[in-house]
């Protein structure tokens, strides 16, 4: 797929992406690499200059209506999607739009708000919430219809450590409960490590690497060349002479403890 803007700028330059049903794919790349443009094509918001897009068995743009009924999305700027007077109305909005009776939609919205631990926000205006609260409300609206495909565009951008950790935990749990396919974009290698079953690295609108998180995210040279920051524990272990450092932080800790133990035994 290729997408060129009217001035000739190539935002996506021959990029190919295949996602299996039920898979969690993280598209990893620096700002300006084409991640959001790619998602806009999957959502039918843009039409490619060249190439073909097929989502959930439907060719776009012809099947865009059917596709959108089966997709949940959290945009990078969630203010663009939180449009109703209250949180409860916002979460119920997509359900009502899909034809669910209003009372049933509000009941389902309350269930998902409670599931995410934000039921106390249901009467609050979304525009007055914190950044982390807004992301959770947007996530509630995205998963309330139990989508086949969940799309998350830079979902932890601007969140502090605690909010990021909560968001990641909830995504993992919801994925397990609902079984949706997931495509997530980010520049944060740690988020990719936490949520990806497969990682696709893009730079300047092109795929530069694809594979398991263990293979991709521990390749320090690849990550740096792609304009990204490698996981700190991976960098540390590489400096200590470990050629193939583990991606899992617990395994890294065990390895460091073992190395320190060997060093202490060798230096009584």
From Swiss-Prot:
Topology term for the membrane: Peripheral membrane protein
Domain ABC transporter positions: 1-229
SUPFAM superfamilies assigned: P-loop containing nucleoside triphosphate hydrolases
Entry GO MF terms: ATP binding; ATP hydrolysis activity; ATPase-coupled transmembrane transporter activity
Cellular localization per UniProt: Cell membrane
EC number: 7.-.-.-
Entry keywords, A to Z: ATP-binding, Cell membrane, Membrane, Nucleotide-binding, Translocase, Transport
InterPro entries hit by this protein: AAA+_ATPase, ABC_transporter-like_ATP-bd, ABC_transporter-like_CS, ABC_transpr_CbiO/EcfA_su, ECF_ABC_transporter_ATP-bd, P-loop_NTPase
Top-rank EC class of the record's enzyme: translocase
GO cellular component, one term: ATP-binding cassette (ABC) transporter complex
Annotated ATP binding sites: 29-36
Function, as annotated: Probably part of an ABC transporter complex. Responsible for energy coupling to the transport system.
Recorded family membership: Belongs to the ABC transporter superfamily.
Protein name in UniProt: Putative ABC transporter ATP-binding protein MK0182
